[in-house]
Amino acid sequence: MNRHLLASWLIGAALLGAAGCKPAAVPEEFPQAAADGWLAAFNSGDAEGLALMYSQQSEVLPPDEPIVSGAARIEQFWRDYQPGQVRLEISDVEVSKLGDYWYREGNYTALVQDEGMPRIGKFIELWVLEGSAWQLYRHMWSPNSPPPAEMPPVAPAG
């Protein structure tokens, strides 16, 4: 068999095989609109709107406090927290798809009314699709505490 005929057969077989392949899936994007909705509800002080952003099995893990779970408790947590008194800005955000969840982490700056210095920290979120809405499944944040300027002396053992 001559080379040209063999090459034609190989190209034809490759094209025929490729014709039966499924097109490449379009990569799913992070549900940014949901995250933007949470931030808008927080900055406007809408505790009820914040509570609606969490899934049925959601847990909020605030710093220095017990885990908060259940829709009523999450809403009460945000009412007590008084969002809207704090202007939250986020930065350095990274997202990644983990199975059925979207993972998002980044830094935040909290601008508190009547305080001169912003509070800076980091956050982690897991988002899950419930019905047709992306909702928070886990939500955790913590402030970046500055290290002490000087360590106290250690008392001698004895």
Question: Language-model segments: which ranges?
Answer:
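Short, low-complexity N-terminal intrinsically disordered segments enriched in polar/charged residues
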Residues: A19-Q56, A72, P148-G158
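A short gly/proline-enriched turn/hairpin at secondary-structure junctions
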Residues: M53, S58-V68, D80-G84
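Bacterial N-terminal signal peptides
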Residues: S8-A18
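Surface-exposed, charged secondary-structure patches
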Residues: E75-M117
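Positively charged n-region of N-terminal signal peptides that target proteins for export
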Residues: M1-L5
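Short beta-strand edge/turn micro-motifs at domain boundaries
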Residues: K22-A24, I120-P147
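A mature extracytoplasmic/lumenal domain signature
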Residues: Y54, D64, E94, N107-Y108, ...
